From Swiss-Prot:
Domain GIY-YIG as annotated: residue spans: 42-120
Presence of keyword Cell inner membrane: no
Protein name: UvrABC system protein C
CDD domains in the record: GIY-YIG_UvrC_Cho
PROSITE patterns per the UniProt record, alphabetical: GIY_YIG, UVR, UVRC
MF terms (GO), sorted A to Z: DNA binding; excinuclease ABC activity
Encoding gene, per UniProt annotation: uvrC
Organism: Granulibacter bethesdensis (strain ATCC BAA-1260 / CGDNIH1)
Assembly information from the UniProt record: Interacts with UvrB in an incision complex.
Purpose of the protein: The UvrABC repair system catalyzes the recognition and processing of DNA lesions. UvrC both incises the 5' and 3' sides of the lesion. The N-terminal half is responsible for the 3' incision and the C-terminal half is responsible for the 5' incision.
Protein family: Belongs to the UvrC family.
């Protein structure tokens, strides 16, 4: 395939002001589109349909902007969904690109960022964990990594579908290759082996139980295994075990035998043959009841790195092929694609999608729909998982809707609540105070909408009202602004607010919201019963006398889960904040010492005490520490001393 003459990784629109942007003249519906046609070039690009508030209704790409946009003027040929979109269009924006492949990448980025109402939108706000092997230490560390891969002296393998999947792999690497997982600072301060050495999951390089050369051999074996050469490693270990037995080194032979068993176990649980699959993502879609589930299996080096289910938002008119095509473009917007994507359906413009992903990756990316053999079996396995996951979700949604209908009836809401917000706070005698908001609705917990509030104002120990006031003022003051700006703010407005407490808390919160100008939110306070027994809660709400629910009422269980989730989130948030405070050291009081330099110092000297005792020359020799910074550190710990 001839690669297009364009950058290897096309810049996003926001980062590329040189891309020509054309705005439509004022109008509405077909009128604004017809007026726009006079300005459009016969070139590739991306177009956006906007409503009266400037919100994106639809984002599309085209080989020829002029021809593609012209198709929207033929209303009678459009499906009902696009007819409604055209009728709501008040303005348009056009961005031209170098190639159609670049337009496809930009379209996927804009859809993911703007979430237009009439597009298929991938709801995926999670980052994916990777396996990282450090390379800037004599004895490399293996660990889980999440986030940007900015550490140059490190190798990465992944992605993995979940933290569980990568943790399982780390455990396997410890058992088979005896690699250390401790931090550099812990490594530098060990005086005897840790428990992992006792259970044969580490070779204890921290206390010289293994030479640097032998450890390097283990690292090389681990790299080979992660690259799909497990069979080769197994043969090599078998040879080493035989040699140890012949030399009557039975303890060493037994240790190697245990490593072979671990390797055999890992390979025996693999679902694919490394020789036939290698590096690929297996992607299958299943549709039912107007909804879709997309299952992605991550295969790297012939190993199954786990799978994850996605539920893209779309209308019931979208086909499985439509959903799969939109999913692939958006899914790889912020992550590198593997060389092979195995699909259960062909998608529209499959060659163009392959070209765009190849452009992004800087190498060939193939999209393939297998019809026989092991690859077909793997795709069928992913398809079965997609079907079963969607069946579970539909069943859960039906049950969730019944519970929400019960909540609406119980608290006299006009309709089933789409967004319930639950608030709680946590502190110890006024220290490290945090408030939290958790959100639930028809889809269950909306964890991307959870919020933490670090309480800024001075808090009198035990003054929970002051904490609640600050939290609600910040949340609803911002919410009012967002609500006035467009439909997204309206969608994020709660139908019901739950708080932990009784009549006093309910009255206080109503007073806070009245001061802000919020009068259309239903408030409910949940008070614990006598002896704080679960199941004997009292419910307080405006316009109703306090009441209890029957102990086995499903709605009672649901409301308890809402309250308990807010309490759990508040406790974990407070603990995280408290831990952050407790790990402060004297290094935090030195000007110019941020997180990166602090980490460099602790990794080099092992502790803040080691930094304090270090001489100026040793500080200047620390990687990442300039001479000026070293002098500042030395002067902090040795006031009055000359820094020669």
């Amino acid at each position: 395939m001839t690669m297009p003459d364009a950058p290897a990784n096309p810049p996003k629109e926001a980062d590329n002001p040189s891309l020509p942007i054309v705005e439509a003249p004022p109008g509405k519906g077909v009128t604004v589109i017809e007026a726009m046609l006079k300005l459009l070039p016969d070139r590739p690009g991306v177009y956006r349909m906007l409503d009266g508030q400037g919100e994106a209704l639809y984002v599309g790409k085209a080989r020829s902007l002029k021809k593609r946009v012209a198709s929207y003027t033929q209303i009678h040929r459009l499906p009902e969904r696009l007819r409604r979109m055209v009728s709501e269009t008040v303005s348009m924006e056009i961005v031209t690109t170098h190639t159609e492949a670049e337009a496809l990448l930009l379209e996927a980025n804009l859809i993911k960022r703007l979430k237009p109402r009439f597009n298929i939108v991938l709801r995926d706000d999670k980052s994916y964990p990777w396996l990282m092997l450090t390379e800037d230490h004599a004895f490399p560390q293996i660990m889980k990594h999440r986030g940007a891969q900015t550490r140059k002296a490190a190798s990465y393998w992944g992605p993995f579908a979940s933290a569980w999947a990568v943790n399982q792999t780390v455990t396997a690497m410890q058992r088979i290759f005896l690699l250390r997982s401790c931090s550099d600072s812990v490594f530098a301060n060990r005086s005897r082996p840790c428990l992992l050495f006792q259970i044969r999951r580490c070779s204890a390089p921290c206390v010289d139980r293994i030479s640097q050369e032998d450890y390097a051999e283990l690292v090389d074996q681990a790299r080979a295994f992660l690259s799909g050469r497990g069979t080769e490693i197994q043969r090599d270990l078998a040879r080493q075990m035989e040699q140890a037995a012949e030399a009557l080194e039975f303890e060493r032979a037994a240790a190697i035998r245990d490593r072979i068993r671990g390797l055999t176990h890992v390979q025996g649980t693999a679902v694919v043959n490394p020789a036939s699959i290698g590096n690929a993502d297996v992607i299958a879609v299943w549709q039912d009841a107007g909804q879709s589930c997309v299952q992605v299996f991550f295969i790297r080096g012939g190993h199954n790195n786990g799978n994850r289910a996605f539920y893209p938002a779309h209308t019931s008119a979208e086909t499985a092929q439509d959903v799969l095509g939109a999913f692939i473009a958006q899914f790889y917007d912020d992550k590198p694609p593997p060389p092979l994507l195995l699909l259960n359906h062909t998608i529209a413009e499959q060659e163009l999608v392959s070209e765009a992903l190849s452009l992004k990756a800087g190498r060939r990316v193939e999209l393939h729909v297998p019809v026989r053999g092991e690859k077909r079996a793997v795709v069928a396995h992913a398809e079965t998982n997609a079907r079963e996951a969607l069946e579970r979700k539909l069943a859960e949604s039906a049950g969730q809707n019944r519970l929400l209908d019960g909540v609406a009836e119980l608290f006299d809401l006009p309709t089933r609540p789409n967004r319930i917000e639950i608030y709680d706070n946590s502190h110890i005698m006024g220290t490290n105070p945090y408030g939290v908001m958790v959100v639930a609705g028809p889809e269950g917990w909306n964890k991307s909408a959870y919020r933490k509030f670090s309480i800024r104002g001075p808090i009198t120990p035990g003054d929970d009202f002051a904490m609640m006031r600050e939290m609600l003022e910040r949340r609803f003051s911002r919410g009012l602004k967002e609500r006035a700006e467009g439909p997204e703010g309206e969608a994020n407005w709660p139908d019901l607010v739950l708080i932990d407490g009784g009549a006093g808390q309910l009255s206080a919160v109503r007073g806070i919201l009245d001061e802000i100008g919020v009068t259309d939110v239903k408030l409910v306070a949940i008070a614990k019963g006598p002896d704080r027994d679960a199941g004997r809660e009292w419910f307080h709400t405006e316009g109703q006398a306090p009441f209890q629910l029957p102990p086995r009422d499903p709605v009672l269980y649901y409301l308890q889960r809402l309250r308990d989730e807010a309490h759990r989130f508040a406790i974990t948030t407070h603990r995280a904040g408290r831990s952050k405070t407790l790990v402060r050291s004297e290094l935090d009081d030195i000007d110019g010492i941020g997180a990166a330099r602090k980490r460099a110092l602790l990794n080099h000297f092992g502790s803040a005490r080691g930094v304090k005792q270090a001489g100026l020359a040793a500080l200047e020799a620390t990687p990442g520490i300039s001479k000026e910074t070293a002098r500042r550190i030395y002067a902090h710990f040795h006031p009055g001393a000359r820094a020669d």
